[in-house]
Amino acid sequence: MQIKKTKLAIIAGGGDLVLSTIKSCNRQNISFFLIGIKDHYNNQIHPPDINLSLNNIGNIFSILKNEKILNIVFIGSIKKPYLTKLRPNFLTIYYILLIMLYYFKGDDKLLTKIYNIFLRKGFKVLDVRKLLKSNIANNKYNNLKNFKNKITLKEISYYFNLAKKNGSFDKGQAVIVDGNKVLLSEDRKGTDNLIYRYKLLDRIDNFSLLVKTSKPNQNMYFDLPTLGPTTIENVYLSGIRGIIIEKNNSLIVDPHDTFKLIKKYNLFYYAI
């Protein structure tokens, strides 16, 4: 990987994939500078080199310049704040004005605008999958053979397309399905909240599934669909019977533990 010769900036929000990215850099002897987004970055094992508030996010370009960094990667979750709750400095206000037209048009348009700002500043945004190859979802653990009396390949494909169609409205990456229809859709509160809302319904469904895919127009440098042990635990406790996920475009947190739990709880899993 070409970045081995230069320092990499990891711009990190919350979630366990941040630590996976750090470990990958260490294994490959990639020098990195970790920028944690305040109130989102939550890794206690590896404190960030700098903790940057969204109120001062406009300072990020001078920070990168001072560190002589050109290559950057985004990893982890950052909830889009309500603008009325921000107290930005003057430089951040300038960048907010640049993205204002896109702020309320959905995450995809907003993230692409942010991506283009970094490019125009001379930075190269890298695909985090290059660092997390062992975390990319594949079909190695597909277990359809154990559930052939419950679901068919045709139904799997249909549910996958339902999730993609839902994602085309830029409202979320995940849906819960059963009986050839969408029962609930993800909103800005995320996948675990979607599962919680399903649990509150106390439904008795035939074979409800969580389906998670990238959105059709998604910028793949940000916010890839993610599945990990916490979500698997929540799926099981909610009564959902399994997961369909998009292979190659999704990331698995702690694959060993994740698939161990899927097997333990006898959950359906299919990467399509």
Where are each of the predicted segments found?
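N-terminal basic/disordered segments at the start of proteins
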Residues: 3-37
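General beta-strand structural signal in soluble alpha/beta enzymes
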Residues: 10-12, 34-36, 72-75, 125-130, ...
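Conserved mixed alpha/beta catalytic, RNA-binding, or beta-rich assembly cores of soluble enzyme
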Residues: 15-18, 25, 51-54, 104-108, ...
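Short acidic, glycine/serine/threonine-rich loops at helix termini
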Residues: 21, 44-46, 84-87, 137-140, ...
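Feature captures the catalytic cores and cofactor-binding loops of soluble hydro-lyases/lyases
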Residues: 37-69, 86-99, 193-272
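Selective hydrophobic functional segments
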Residues: 70-73, 83
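Short glycine-rich anion-binding loops that position phosphate/pyrophosphate groups of nucleotides
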Residues: 77-80, 215-216
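Ser/Thr/Gly-rich flexible loops in soluble cytosolic domains mediating phosphotransfer, phosphorylation
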Residues: 88-130
